[in-house]
Amino acid sequence: MVQISEVKGNSRDNRTAAHTHIKGLGLNSQGIAEKQASGFVGQTTAREACGVVVDLIKAHKMAGRGVLLAGGPGTGKTALALAISQELGTKIPFCPITGSEIYSTEVKKTEVLMENFRRAIGLKVRETKEVYEGEVTELTPEEAENPLGGYGKTITTLLIGLKSAKGQKKLRLDPSIYEAIQKERVTVGDVIYIEANTGACKRVGRSDAYATEFDLEAEEYVPIPKGEVHKKKEIVQDVSLHDLDVANARPQGGQDIMSMMGQLMKPKMTEITDKLRSEINKVVSKYIDQGVAELVPGVLFIDEAHMLDVECFTYLNKALESPISPIVVLASNRGMTGIRGAEDLVAAHGIPPDFLSRLLIIPTTAYDPEEIKRIVKIRSTTEGVKITEAAIDKIAEHGVRISLRYCLQLLTPASILAKVNGRNEIDVQDVAECEDLFLDARRSAALLSSEQGQEFIC
């Protein structure tokens, strides 16, 4: 019996996250925000300001500066930062962190900040490779007397003829390449390529002109390469400065048992010294001066920036002034509040005034009922949920009265309740049932403060 097996695809279903519907800032060609575009609704002023920031980043004129997205909870600050990253594309580094991520028992908080700073700075390295590619027409090693004496002879040079579709060349190669050619078992009629920079030689296969030479042969026949024998190829690699730091701080390698055991064990989080970073900066500057590499300042996004303490803000002050620094985008939903680490000092957004004066502040405003209604429609389409107009009005009412997050979280449970009740669409009854099953923050707080809620308190 012939075995037939089904090949299953390896594609995964992507989880619908809170900002899956955001595809960009939704600006037209003049940089003016449309009322509803790319998953965004409202916040036209903030989106236009972020569009200007994106243009400055792409023009490499914003490095070493800071932006603060300030507004209440649920006004789209994280969505704006995500839209900035999507507008920039994959070639410009975008490193998102939260303010509480930097606190660790193993590593200093300033070290974690610097690591993320270096992650947000990219380096575009251009390398030009010279390649000789063609069918071997001649292979002649030139010998000479051994300079050390004796009867033996040594190979001084190797003459090799290569033929391509557009012409042929005769090359005189170093004797070290002869060893590589011997290892590859290259003979006349084989198609090979030789890298001029490294001297690496690779046998591609046998020329298809010799395909009828033998009846039985386990050879791979390839056509003669197109174009000239001598070709130049430009290879562009994108790396971050943190990748270079890690590669030099913890070099991999070693075939002894201790090295192999060290690679298997969980690596301990260690600090990268300032001396190593300064050496890497020197090498990077040298490459930039030579035109081999190009620095690409990216974006470091710090959400919940009020969670940073005084020491972190002092360090950020210094880091922003360094010659190699990214664009720092912070987000905070606090008003006048105490600064962490110096609670007696009250400042706007929980950020010290000296650091706040460095930032361009983009405010976000609360959504009106009509905008919340549109957001509910977009989210229902994204989550694949059918909903009636009356139910949209009811959910939007919760968004105005309670919060946008709470009303959007009701969509999926309401769709499950609608299916249980034998309906394809979410109706007002399903929303009301969800409201009874799931409390919002205000009702929960009111319940705990009442006499009925005393039994919940231990």
From Swiss-Prot:
Entry annotated with the keyword Cytoplasm: no
Pfam families, per the entry: TIP49, TIP49_C
Enzyme Commission number, as recorded: 3.6.4.12
Main location (coarse class): nucleus
A cellular-component GO term for this protein: Swr1 complex
SMART domains, A to Z: AAA
Subcellular location: Nucleus
Nucleotide-binding found in the keyword field: yes
Catalytic activity: ATP + H2O = ADP + phosphate + H(+)
Name of the protein described by the UniProt record: RuvB-like helicase 1
